[in-house]
């Protein structure tokens, strides 16, 4: 949708800015209409953790403590008032955005040829999707499939914002029925993206929400090895997110056969160490506890022992190093970790 069709509909630029400002994107849409582009700042190498690639981030100002600033880690564009008269409109709640404005955003998304503009629109839609009423409206407008179409966008930042928007939409159970068909594409993004990238993190967040209930967990049964491999090559933030998915899956007894026979890197067991970050170690112990609660028959156990490098042999077999490592963790300074270890060993 170009300038000529938007401006007459809403009268003037102030009105248009007011429409989407509550969704945290007035400045971004102003740039979209005016043909401008938003700036990106590259983080300096000095501020990056070792082994983490430099990432480009949208130059925005967050509203500290706001709801949207906490939802799925999405950045929120701070509205910039055009004048005093429009200030009240600009600070509307994203939950009060009108249906026709959501339609307009989806239409703009489909017609935009500019990657920064697509990012800004997806960011706005993602912020709107933090509210149930908008989650339902976007689904009814077939917006889920419109948004998901950008999972294959050639620009990485567009794919990240697409995943973030789908993640918020996924908090709605009805929306999950529409989003589940994109699981293979999301898994491919994880596998093909650079290690420790924003793309991997955003994709894992989406899979976490999708795997909270048992209904769609079977869609991930072929991805166990991929998830286990991520544990040994990624930074803490991605390890935590990966373990959230694994804990969800291992909480379902129907998934256990697929989990224990999946090929697993032997180095997974090395993470059960006092030097591992507590946030990672606690979830590892929860995952291990779920595995320990599984009781295979003698015949099944014998069959699994013949599967070289499967998770059963790495973590559950008598030959595994896990038991000795758990004993060492009984002296961990974190009391919660001690309790988790004691529960597994008893």
What are these regions (language model features)?
Residues 2-130:
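N-terminal "cap/leader" segments of large eukaryotic alpha-helical scaffolds
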Residues 33-36, 142, 155, 263:
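Conserved functional loop/turn residues at catalytic and ligand-binding sites
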Residues 73-79, 113-126, 155-168, 178-181, ...:
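Alpha-helical solenoid repeats of the armadillo/HEAT superfamily
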Residues 104-111, 149-150, 185-193, 226-230, ...:
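Alpha-solenoid HEAT/Armadillo-like helical repeat scaffolds in large eukaryotic proteins
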């Amino acid at each position: 949708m170009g300038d000529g069709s938007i401006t007459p509909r809403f009268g003037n630029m102030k009105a248009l800015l007011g429409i989407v400002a509550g969704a945290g994107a007035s400045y971004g849409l102003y740039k979209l209409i005016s043909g401008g582009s938003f700036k990106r700042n590259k983080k300096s190498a000095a501020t990056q953790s070792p082994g983490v690639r430099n990432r480009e981030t949208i130059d925005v100002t967050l509203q500290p403590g706001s709801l949207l600033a906490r939802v799925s880690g999405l950045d929120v564009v701070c509205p910039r008032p055009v004048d005093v008269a429009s200030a009240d409109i600009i600070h509307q709640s994203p939950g009060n955005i009108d249906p026709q404005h959501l339609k307009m955003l989806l239409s703009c998304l489909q017609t935009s040829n500019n990657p920064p503009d697509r990012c800004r629109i997806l960011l706005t839609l993602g912020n709107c999707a933090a509210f149930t009423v908008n989650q339902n409206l976007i689904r009814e407008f077939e917006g889920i499939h419109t948004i998901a179409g950008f999972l294959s966008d050639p620009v990485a930042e567009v794919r990240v914002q697409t995943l973030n928007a789908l993640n918020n939409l996924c908090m709605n159970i009805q929306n999950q029925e529409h989003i589940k068909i994109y699981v293979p594409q999301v898994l491919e993004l994880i596998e093909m993206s650079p290690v420790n990238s924003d793309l991997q993190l955003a994709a894992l967040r989406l899979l976490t929400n999708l795997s909270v209930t048992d209904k769609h967990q079977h869609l991930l049964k072929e991805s166990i090895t991929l998830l286990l491999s991520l544990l040994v090559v990624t930074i803490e933030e991605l390890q935590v997110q990966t373990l959230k998915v694994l804990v969800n899956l291992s909480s379902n007894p129907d998934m256990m056969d697929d989990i224990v026979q999946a090929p697993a890197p032997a180095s997974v067991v090395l993470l059960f160490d006092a030097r591992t970050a507590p946030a990672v170690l606690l979830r590892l112990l929860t995952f291990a506890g779920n595995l320990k609660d599984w009781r295979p028959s003698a015949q099944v156990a014998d069959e699994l022992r013949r599967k070289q490098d499967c998770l059963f042999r790495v973590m559950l077999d008598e030959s595994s190093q896990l038991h000795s490592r758990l004993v060492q963790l009984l002296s961990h300074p974190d009391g919660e970790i001690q309790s988790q270890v004691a529960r597994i060993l008893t």
